[in-house]
Amino acid sequence: MSIVRMTDLDLSGKRVLIRQDLNVPIENGRITSEQRITASLPTLKRALEQGAAVMVTSHLGRPKEGVWSEADSLAPVAQRLSELLGREVPLVRDWVDGVDVQPGQLVLLENCRMNVGEGKDDEALSKKYAALCDVFVMDAFGTAHRAQASTHGVIRFAPVAAGGPLLMAELDALAQALDAPAKPLLAIVAGSKVSTKLELLASLVGKVDQLIVGGGIANTFIAAAGYNVGKSLYEPDLLDTAKKIVADAKARGADIPLPVDVVTAKQFLPDAVAEVKAVDAVAEDDLILDIGPQTAAQYAQLIENAGTVVWNGPVGVFEFEAFSKGTEALARAIASSNAFSIAGGGDTLAAVDKFDIAAQVSYISTGGGAFLEFLEGKTLPAVAALDARGA
């Protein structure tokens, strides 16, 4: 890729518009997780230290275009940024036609999704964004898969368009995991449905040496292998698809190991009685809610021997203590492994937090949908636009 990096530019005296992902959860006007704000700070500080006139924007929620609403305002974000940076960060409304900002100053531009034309990547709006700055910096990997005016259109028209440190770190880590991975490459893909991860499974099966499936996805593969899954969540209409994925893996020498034992319950409840069973001993009224200890040990061994691990999804109902042991075993194995590891997806990050292994994971992707689309081999609009500008 030939993307211009913000870190290679001299921003002194330049008007710099930075698209961040500051879409933080807010309840009753209070920010409940400020991870995305703190992640953006090094980028903002670097631009300020170089003497740039810094404008930052982000989306928050899904406001109606053309309508300002307090619920979707970045006001709480501006306040928190002011506290973290130790300087006033003014929030600017109605900013599309011009922003008054001086070198060494930083302003936050109100929720870009309130601007008419943002969602449809409107060309006229994109040109107005571009006219605000000398340099546009795309630093919001979490929205890189959306072709919108602030993530795509502006890149086409800004005098200079660059990838920010957060975005580039994400792309560098993903490239290390997928383009030239240390072998063996092991992927863990889990979730409730094969249908939502079908493209991901099909893409990864052409790249990985081992593919561990978990959750409802694993149940479909277990059923495809001819075992009873009882009342477990699975997709009977995708059994042939699961068989094909297994066959495709085998054809290129890759392996999709199935659980040898599982943890079952009669009800989907936090206090349900958990019972470990061999995979061929699941009863008609059983729910499979986790992998069993033997399987967890086998998978942990694969992780220990891996050169690269890509983790997307917990392998059991880890929110329920009795059914969290499988996910914990894999999390601990990733933490102690020497492999280059990358973890992404909301539930995965919750598991990383629950088992307190963030410091031991090589790279934690905050991308969500963009992370999945990249793993699926899709071209991300923002990345493609930056690449075209850098060519």
Swiss-Prot record:
It is found in: Cytoplasm. One of its GO terms (cellular component) is cytosol. Keywords: ATP-binding, Cytoplasm, Glycolysis, Kinase, Nucleotide-binding, Transferase. The keyword Translocase does not apply. Substrate binds at D21, L22, N23, R36, H59, L60, G61, R62, R113, R146. It is an enzyme of class 2 (transferase). Gene3D superfamilies: Phosphoglycerate kinase, N-terminal domain. GO terms for biological process: gluconeogenesis; glycolytic process. Coiled coil: none annotated. Pathway: Carbohydrate degradation; glycolysis; pyruvate from D-glyceraldehyde 3-phosphate: step 2/5. Its EC number is 2.7.2.3. ATP binds at K197, E319, G345, G346, D347, T348. It holds the Pfam family PGK. It catalyses: (2R)-3-phosphoglycerate + ATP = (2R)-3-phospho-glyceroyl phosphate + ADP. It comes from the Bacteria. The keyword Kinase applies. GO terms for molecular function: ADP binding; ATP binding; phosphoglycerate kinase activity. PROSITE patterns: PGLYCERATE_KINASE. Belongs to the phosphoglycerate kinase family. HAMAP family: Phosphoglyc_kinase (MF_00145). Monomer. This is Phosphoglycerate kinase. It comes from Stenotrophomonas maltophilia (strain R551-3). The lineage of its organism: Bacteria, Pseudomonadati, Pseudomonadota, Gammaproteobacteria, Lysobacterales.
